[in-house]
């Protein structure tokens, strides 16, 4: 609720007024959406713990009791999850029903009444989508309770499932029941969204629709907006990440006894091979999951966009449900499926091996890839593929000469999104990692649980920095490929013309 309200308020201000800190707010929102919650939560632990940055350097004695309480955790989650509402609602507000707004004002409506009776009702789908995104991501979040478990015990369903698996004796029955409850809650939230929206129409794109252009605010309001935007970007990003950087250079578990040292980085990178080994495992799993997920996701998106398959609507709904399933529930499901004696008798030994992490990561990546590719394919008319088919082009030629050239940027975005999400998927890796096999996210999480703050902070900065550099490098290397032979490079390079020339030349 609070995350939706906060994100909606910022989105409306961002669309209505033009201020310099708006771009900074956009960047912070996208970084928060990509960055795993357990890394943000660890930063808040380093900042607000009893011997953290806030108390030791700023003299805020009561900060620990405020942050590590139910209201404090709600505050942290709002700061971490509001970008879902901000980005969703901001996208919906980019077009304005100007004709309807003028009609309301002519009939005596004030600016507030015009927003309440015209703009807000038309954005109900965006508000509902934002609310359910925040709700599903929060209720299934395993990273935050895992990250703060060393300093504060806050029981959530995902963490209770994790504890059931690592209790003595192992309670598979309890883990299964709690996972079922969690899925039921998520399904109930999705049903509630459909009931609120019903069969009403919310489309308003016509000749009276114009793109919203931010106005220049009054001087005092502009200063206030810039200060607010800069402060929010600092609070949401610089506080947790900056605290992690500070702790990574500390020679003590307490910032109060801070002494600058590079020993943490030396131990992580040079003396201990665990980080590099975990990073190698995570990169391999993420690459395999992204490639396999991209192949399967491309096929699913093609079926949903261009085929007459009778059950494609069912596939679309299932992909949305799969997108909502938390990683810890997915991991439990894979344990129940693959930890069967008859499967071992068939020679399909998956449980207790890295292969099961790859399978679970593929399952988690496919819904994300499918949504990204489906949005890209929706812009390519089916008539183009139908015309190529009439000229004798087979499926592989249509994909190779039409879809791939036009979807280069979308494919790269889908691959990198799946790759980054798989590297930092703490829930799946924690539940399914085999004995004597570590991954980057598990390695970092274990360090925090063991109160090795400086060591785990250095591992976070080093490992996360390497992953970010690899993603940026991949983006730079594929930038030329995304532009090469694109439809903007002349009519002779357009996919439909290349196809026609190829058919004429045999």
Language-model features, listed with the residues they occupy:
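Transmembrane alpha-helical segments of polytopic membrane transport and secretion proteins
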Residues: 112, 194-232, 473-506
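Membrane-water interface segments at the C-terminal ends of transmembrane alpha-helices
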Residues: 1-94, 122-142, 147-149, 177-194, ...
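Short amphipathic alpha-helical coupling elements at transmembrane boundaries
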Residues: 26-29, 98-106, 117, 160-167, ...
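Transmembrane helix boundary and interhelical loop/hinge segments in multi-pass membrane proteins
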Residues: 88-100, 111, 124, 157, ...
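Glycine-rich helix-loop "coupling/hinge" segments at transmembrane-helix boundaries
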Residues: 143-169, 254-258, 425-453, 488
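Glycine/proline-centered hinge or cleavage motifs at structural transition points of membrane proteins
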Residues: 107-108, 121, 391-393, 405
